UniProtKB/Swiss-Prot annotation:
This is Putative protein p31. InterPro entries: DUF2824 (IPR022568). Pfam families: DUF2824 (PF11039). It comes from Acyrthosiphon pisum secondary endosymbiont phage 1 (Bacteriophage APSE-1). The gene is 31.
């Protein structure tokens, strides 16, 4: 497993627009625009992109992070990748607080947030449309210090 900034945007775009891989990460229309204020960090097995983290620079030192993994690379694999990504984030990005939101239908997302010592901030009603269903999102946050200390406790 290797964590690094995605350099091949075409490979990334093919990955992200494949609904079988990304599930609820995309709205109904299946369109996604790469954003200039985001950094995309890939999770690789050899040359194969199996997941990624998007980092959006919101304001000052506040960042929003979202992970997406192929179905065969979720669960324990995603947890290990998130731990490595957290270390990469701490060492490479200047930030004070991370926020993320997780669809209520994504149980491993909640588990990973809890293991990262993220605090539940609230629920955003009807934040995502998947199929013909509205899905609520749970909002989480963690400071850089809490993130560092949270993973230290898990060693």
């Amino acid at each position: 497993m290797e964590i690094k900034v995605i350099e091949n945007i075409e490979q990334f775009y093919r990955f992200f627009t494949d609904k079988a891989k990304v599930g609820y990460a995309m709205e109904n229309n299946g369109e996604y625009q790469l954003k200039n204020n985001q950094l995309y960090v890939g999770v690789y097995e050899g040359l194969m992109l199996v997941g990624f983290f998007s980092i959006e620079f919101i304001r000052n030192k506040l960042i929003e992070v979202h992970p997406v993994f192929e179905p065969g690379f979720r669960g324990q694999y995603a947890l290990a990748a998130t731990k490595r990504f957290s270390n990469w984030l701490i060492n490479n990005i200047h930030f004070s607080t991370v926020i993320t939101y997780v669809p209520e239908k994504t149980p491993w997302g909640k588990v990973i947030c809890q293991l990262m010592k993220m605090r539940k901030v609230g629920v955003i009603d009807n934040a995502l449309t998947a199929g013909h269903h509205q899905i609520n999102m749970t909002l989480y946050q963690v400071t850089k210090e809490e993130l560092v200390n949270g993973w230290k406790q898990r060693r």
